[in-house]
């Protein structure tokens, strides 16, 4: 998983509340277990009309085709649980979503997949959305190390994040990465276990 430290990027405004996971990535695209290729179908129902790009949808317009930050409204990621939702966002290039609040499962899945979900009050999200609407001047900076969002005018907006989740993103650690951090202890345990319980096969962790 890629580290998240400081991100300065185009922010796309999506002024829609209650964007559920089926709007993020429709169920018909969930047959794959690959994390790549899903970005093409991100927001499929809003992004395409009869198989053609909807020119009015924000991610179909420049400079937002290169957006890495999404600013939206309440209850983002609600609906059914599907890890494909953060996969689709990440495959498109989105590394940070800013909203007043998120559905819990989507919020948790985002961290596990290297996406930073930031909760900020609605009035601040509206200000950031106004910033994001300025086309080529819509760049925001998200500084996870200092826990601030920096607007184009230089104003710094602080945000809260669980310290452990912050540590994981800063160091690019997913569940497997966390396990591999303890590989020496795991290897010692396995060596001892082959002596005390030789009937169990030894587990060998993959090389870094």
Swiss-Prot record:
It catalyses: (2R,3S)-3-isopropylmalate = (2S)-2-isopropylmalate. Pathway: Amino-acid biosynthesis; L-leucine biosynthesis; L-leucine from 3-methyl-2-oxobutanoate: step 2/4. GO terms for molecular function: 3-isopropylmalate dehydratase activity. GO terms for cellular component: 3-isopropylmalate dehydratase complex. Its EC number is 4.2.1.33. Catalyzes the isomerization between 2-isopropylmalate and 3-isopropylmalate, via the formation of 2-isopropylmaleate. PANTHER family: 3-ISOPROPYLMALATE DEHYDRATASE SMALL SUBUNIT, 3-ISOPROPYLMALATE DEHYDRATASE SMALL SUBUNIT 2-RELATED-RELATED. Belongs to the LeuD family. LeuD type 1 subfamily. This is 3-isopropylmalate dehydratase small subunit. It comes from Granulibacter bethesdensis (strain ATCC BAA-1260 / CGDNIH1). The gene is leuD.
């Amino acid at each position: 998983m890629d580290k998240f430290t400081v991100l300065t990027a185009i922010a796309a405004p999506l002024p829609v509340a209650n964007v559920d996971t089926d709007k993020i990535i429709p169920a018909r695209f969930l047959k794959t277990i690959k994390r790549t290729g899903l970005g093409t179908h991100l927001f499929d129902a809003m992004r395409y009309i009869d198989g053609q790009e909807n020119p009015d949808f924000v991610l179909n317009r420049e400079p937002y085709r290169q957006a890495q930050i999404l600013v939206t409204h309440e209850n983002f990621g609600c609906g059914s649980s599907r890890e494909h939702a953060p996969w689709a966002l990440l495959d498109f290039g989105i590394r940070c979503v800013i909203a007043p609040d998120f559905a819990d499962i989507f919020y948790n899945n985002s961290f596990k997949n290297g996406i930073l979900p930031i909760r900020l009050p609605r009035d601040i999200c509206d200000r950031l959305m106004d910033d994001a609407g300025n086309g080529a001047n819509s760049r925001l900076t998200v500084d996870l190390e200092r826990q601030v969002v920096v607007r184009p005018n230089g104003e710094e907006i602080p945000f809260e994040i669980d310290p452990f989740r912050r540590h994981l993103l800063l160091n690019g650690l997913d569940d497997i990465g966390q396990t591999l951090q303890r590989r020496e202890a795991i290897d010692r345990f396995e060596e001892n276990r082959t002596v005390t319980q030789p009937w169990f096969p030894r587990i060998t962790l993959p090389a870094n």
